[in-house]
From Swiss-Prot:
Record: active site: 318 (proton acceptor)
Provenance organism: Caenorhabditis elegans
Lineage: Eukaryota, Metazoa, Ecdysozoa, Nematoda, Chromadorea
Biased composition (Polar residues): 115-132
EC number of the protein: 2.7.11.1
Subunit: Interacts with actl-1.
Gene name, Swiss-Prot/TrEMBL: pik-1
Protein's recorded name: Pelle-like serine/threonine-protein kinase pik-1
SMART domains in UniProt: S_TKc
């Protein structure tokens, strides 16, 4: 039975049956057959071919990358079937027969029975070019990639054109350039992993040095919906980072929307994340109290900027120590904006119309109770998360730990506060990071007290009594440690 009867006419190449795609790529890789079809692929440029050659040097399939790039320009399994007809690769046509609609199967007979050019009745892919033109010049006529099309659609739906401005103001790079920058996304270049992607260290030409490349991976979700979600997160982060420039927000340098794996390029943060430094990973030296003060205030200012700049506040939605990054000067910068949303400020207790959201998937230990139970989304969600971060900075403890009798950090701090009151001692004597240098002088003691107090206030279960980010920063500044002269 021919199972192609129910096949949609528009199936992007990466979403065809995996085993069929692998068999096709194996044949195209043999004797570099893929190079013979590349000139017949509209939209494929010489630099794409060169990038595929470099990709093969990393023991990867060059034909798989070629097909992924071609798909990103708007070409489907139907176009691939027609390409094989045009280049008379009958074996590959038969191999992928089940992946295209039956009305195109007549092309196999055409190829078998004739050595002439395939009938003009076949649907022509947009922007067809000859092999000779590919050799002489870059092909400029091609369909927009699904990513670019989605970006364009989102831009048109945005009344302030923020996405269009973001894309126009940010350097586009090719997937091949990122492959070269990261040595083929080598495992040795991995500097971080998360639920939505992997971050690689790389050296990208034109950016002046080392960069961080975030590659949004599919995990176990290779569906079209999964691909769209990864694209949505990339576009959301691109729009936010390009729109909001601040000393404490991670700068974005470039982006790539080719293929099924969108990538964003950022400033490389040589001191890693706040989480890394609090846990002293890789043998790093514990943060001093002056550094903790500057990180707390700087990160607070960055988050406060998002909440207060513009008519509509930006809610980050995933504030945690892993998403506060530290540059070579230990200056904090907030990153990972893939989950952020426009939202509501909740400055008054009588706020009656908070945004109800179901798409924020922030780390559970940092999520406010009103979001967990009712999906209520206001700026106070970020305030709650930041309160947890401040308690981590004070104590060096994780936001959640199975090894503690009281697993949640807020509850753990409250237990210690009650214990300190019973012993008639300051809570800082119990709730303090033992790895940090000893407190020196009243200023450092006062700052730690403030850190604990405002951390608990920010992480209050009642969102209506939580302070705003501007109030938190103001309070920390009043109780800050004078800089060392």
């Amino acid at each position: 039975m021919d199972d192609s009867l129910g096949v949609s006419e528009v199936v992007m190449i990466p979403f065809m049956k995996r085993e069929v795609l692998q068999q096709i790529c194996a044949i195209l890789d043999t004797d570099n057959t893929w190079e013979t079809i590349a000139p017949y692929m509209p939209g494929i440029e010489l630099r794409d071919v060169e990038g595929c050659k470099r990709y093969s040097s990393y023991n990867q399939s060059p034909s798989e990358l070629l097909l992924r790039i071609w798909s990103s320009k708007g070409y489907s399994t139907t176009h691939l079937y027609q390409l094989f007809a045009k280049t008379k690769l009958i074996r590959l046509m038969r191999m992928m027969r089940s992946q295209v609609h039956e009305k195109y199967h007549y092309l196999e007979n055409k190829v078998t029975n004739s050595t002439s050019r395939v009938s003009k009745q076949m649907v022509q892919p947009p922007g067809s070019q000859s092999a000779s033109r590919l050799k002489k010049t870059e092909i400029k006529e091609s369909s927009p990639s699904p990513a670019a099309a989605a970006a364009s659609q989102l831009s048109r739906s945005n009344t302030d054109d923020t996405l269009r401005v973001a894309i126009e103001g940010t350097l586009p790079v090719t997937y091949c350039e990122l492959l070269e920058a990261t040595n083929g996304f080598a495992v040795s270049n991995v500097i971080g992993k998360g639920g939505y992607g992997t971050v690689y260290k790389g050296e990208l030409k034109g950016t002046g040095g080392i960069v961080a490349v975030k590659r949004l991976h599919s995990g176990n979700d290779t569906s079209q919906n999964g691909s769209r979600e990864r694209l949505r997160q990339s576009l959301t982060e691109l729009r936010t980072l390009a729109r909001f420039r601040h000393d404490n927000i991670l700068p974005i340098y470039a982006y790539s929307l080719e293929g099924s794996e969108p990538c964003l390029v950022y400033q490389f943060m040589s001191n890693g994340s706040l989480e890394d430094r609090l846990l002293c990973r890789k043998g790093s030296v514990p943060l001093t109290w002056i550094q903790r003060k500057e990180i707390s205030i700087g990160a607070g200012r960055g988050l406060g900027f998002l909440h207060s700049f513009g008519k509509t506040p930006i809610i980050h939605g995933d504030i945690k120590t892993a998403n506060i990054l530290l540059d070579k000067h230990m200056e904090p910068k907030i990153g990972d904006f893939g989950l952020c949303r426009d939202g509501h400020v909740e400055a008054e207790a009588m706020e009656k119309h908070p945004l109800i959201a179901s798409h924020i998937k922030g780390t559970l230990a940092y999520l406010a109770p009103e979001f967990i139970t009712s999906k209520i989304l206001t700026t106070k969600l970020d305030v709650y998360s930041f309160g947890i971060v401040l308690l981590e900075i004070a104590s060096g403890q994780r936001a959640y730990s199975d090894s503690r009798e009281t697993r949640g950090l807020v509850e753990y701090c409250q237990v210690n506060k009650e214990l300190a009151a019973h012993r008639k001692i300051p809570v800082r004597e119990i709730f303090i990071d033992r790895r940090a240098p000893p407190l020196v002088g009243d200023e450092e003691k006062s700052f730690l007290d403030a850190l604990i107090e405002v951390g608990l206030a920010g992480a209050n279960n009642d969102r209506k009594v939580r302070p705003t980010m501007s109030q938190i920063v103001e309070y920390l500044c009043k109780n800050s440690i004078p800089p060392v002269v």
